[in-house]
Regions:
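A short, N-terminal "cap"/entry segment at the start of jelly-roll beta-barrel domains
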Residues: 1-42
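Conserved short histidine dyad/triad with adjacent acidic residue
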Residues: 36-55, 89-92
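Short, conserved beta-strand element in jelly-roll/cupin
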Residues: 45, 54-70
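Short beta-strand His + acidic residue motifs that chelate non-heme Fe in jelly-roll/DSBH
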Residues: 52-53, 70-71, 88-89, 93-100
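Structural motif
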Residues: 60, 67, 94, 102-104
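Short acidic-glycine-tyrosine-enriched beta hairpin
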Residues: 74-91
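A short hydrophobic beta-strand segment most commonly corresponding to one strand
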Residues: 85-89, 100-109
Length: 109
C-alpha cells in the first residue's frame, strides 16, 4: 500500500454517515473515508451477521469490540476478539466474516 501525499486530518467516526449492508443474515453498518485508492472504515456487525459474499480483497482488520470469525473458502477459520487483528493480501485467501455476538471493526483496504 502506498499512501499518497495528503495533509494530516482527524476523523470523528461518530460524524461519518453510516451506510447499511445486508448480510445473510444480519446487517453491517459502514462508516467510510476514502483517500485515493485507500478505503478506511469503522464497521459494526449485528449479532449473527454473516457476510453475503466471499471476498478476495486484501485487508488489515482490527477488532475493536466483540468477536468475529473469519471463514476461509477452504474451510479454515480465524477467531478474533477485541484487540486482535488479521491481514490478508489481495487475491490470496477468499474469506467472509461471521459474528455470533456482534462486533465493531477498523478496516483498511
Amino acid at each position: 500500500m502506498k499512501i499518497p501525499a495528503a495533509p494530516i486530518r482527524a476523523i470523528d467516526w461518530s460524524k461519518v454517515e453510516a451506510t447499511e449492508h445486508s448480510g445473510e443474515p444480519g446487517m453491517a453498518l459502514w462508516r467510510t473515508e476514502q483517500l485515493c485508492d485507500i478505503r478506511v472504515r469503522v464497521v459494526e456487525y449485528s449479532a449473527g451477521y454473516i457476510a453475503n459474499h466471499w471476498c478476495a480483497k486484501g485487508h488489515v482488520v482490527l477488532v475493536l469490540a466483540g468477536e468475529i470469525i473469519s471463514q476461509q473458502r477452504d474451510g479454515s477459520e480465524l477467531r478474533l476478539s477485541a484487540g486482535m487483528s488479521y491481514l490478508v493480501g489481495d487475491d490470496c485467501d477468499a474469506h467472509r466474516s461471521y459474528s455470533p455476538t456482534g462486533a465493531k471493526l477498523f478496516i483498511v483496504d
